[in-house]
């Protein structure tokens, strides 16, 4: 029975980390087993339910601080759950109401509450565009593919439910309830996957710098239902010691070797080393040959940023390498943020569009 399988699984796999689940998915999808990400996506609910009692929790400082991306993510899920409850109540009450004026108001309320629920798309987009690129950098490339595919299925289910809701009273309330519950079931399951598996992977893998970058870029995508109550500014500890005021007493060069004499309370000692070649630092204001004339990097940057168009550059290896900065992030036609630079362009799009993206790239 499913219960006995769950019991055996819990007894065997208790204490598994979310990162280990990620590695399992990666191994399945990248081995010769013939398992594709579509197969893993189809069984996503199955293995999420199996692992629900086994995943080991992770605690990281500051994640419950207002404004921290993890706190924002969880707060959004709470607000979205509350909106789901309100829709369910309205749908449940609708069947028992006979007054036509009240039914009209209830239909308006349903559409309004569905509009709030629909803001989950902002939550998903921020997850896909800010969390997933950093996950891929750390080698966790399989969970994003699977989760993005399921996200798109949930988006489709929501659209079906929204169309049905807006079609009242032409369609029966039973049809609306059925469509809404089909969406809500998958949506609530995704909340569990986000908070019990996805966030655990992120907390084990991401550095404070990663979270700071996500917090800084989140405004470009917006927030679902609620906004952070304050900006998260973590305390930063300097790890580089200040240079000592005392400098070495002597520096001599002998046959290309540098000898450095250092004074200590016990006396002097000499170290000999071959200095590294100094890397040439590009002067952003120096003139470089550019097309039919000369431009500095700063001048070229200003020109590109003042063109009346959004520019994205993908190199010959299909790596997203550059975008110009002429439009506020929240007004971009195609939202791009610094965390996406360096990402394979195929990973910048939902899995269901992968073949279309490949065809476009090959055509270019």
Regions found by a protein language model. Give the residues of each.
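Small-residue-biased structural context
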Residues: 1-121, 125-363
């Amino acid at each position: 029975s499913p219960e006995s399988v769950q019991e055996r699984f819990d007894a065997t796999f208790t204490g598994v980390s979310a990162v280990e689940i990620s590695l399992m998915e990666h191994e399945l999808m990248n081995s010769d087993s013939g398992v594709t990400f579509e197969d893993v996506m189809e069984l996503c609910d199955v293995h999420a339910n199996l692992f629900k009692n086994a995943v080991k929790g992770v605690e990281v400082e500051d994640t419950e601080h207002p404004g921290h991306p993890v706190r924002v993510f969880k707060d959004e899920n709470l607000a979205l759950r509350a909106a789901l409850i309100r829709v369910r109540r309205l749908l449940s009450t609708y069947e028992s109401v006979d007054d036509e004026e009240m039914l009209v108001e209830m239909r308006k309320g349903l559409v309004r509450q569905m509009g709030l629920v629909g803001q989950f798309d902002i939550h998903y987009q921020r997850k896909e565009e800010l969390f997933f690129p950093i996950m891929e950098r750390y080698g966790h490339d399989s969970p994003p593919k699977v989760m993005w595919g399921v996200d798109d299925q949930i988006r489709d289910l929501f659209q079906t439910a929204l169309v049905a809701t807006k079609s009242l009273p032409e369609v029966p309330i039973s049809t609306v309830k059925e469509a809404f519950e089909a969406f809500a079931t998958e949506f609530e399951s995704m909340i569990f996957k986000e908070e019990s598996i996805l966030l655990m992977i992120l907390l084990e893998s991401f550095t404070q710098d990663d979270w700071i970058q996500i917090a800084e870029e989140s405004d470009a995508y917006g927030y679902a239902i609620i906004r952070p109550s304050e900006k998260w500014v973590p305390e930063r500890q300097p790890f580089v010691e200040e240079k000592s005021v005392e400098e070495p007493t002597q520096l001599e060069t002998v046959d290309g070797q540098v000898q450095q004499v250092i004074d200590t309370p016990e006396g002097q000692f000499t170290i000999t080393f071959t200095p590294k070649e100094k890397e040439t630092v590009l002067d952003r204001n120096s003139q470089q040959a550019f097309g039919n004339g000369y431009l500095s990097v700063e001048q070229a940057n200003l020109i590109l940023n003042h063109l009346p168009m959004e520019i994205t550059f993908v190199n010959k290896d299909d790596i997203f390498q550059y975008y110009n900065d002429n439009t506020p992030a929240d007004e971009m036609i195609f939202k791009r943020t610094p965390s996406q630079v360096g990402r394979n362009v195929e990973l910048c799009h939902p899995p269901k569009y992968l073949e279309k993206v490949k065809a476009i790239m090959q055509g270019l």
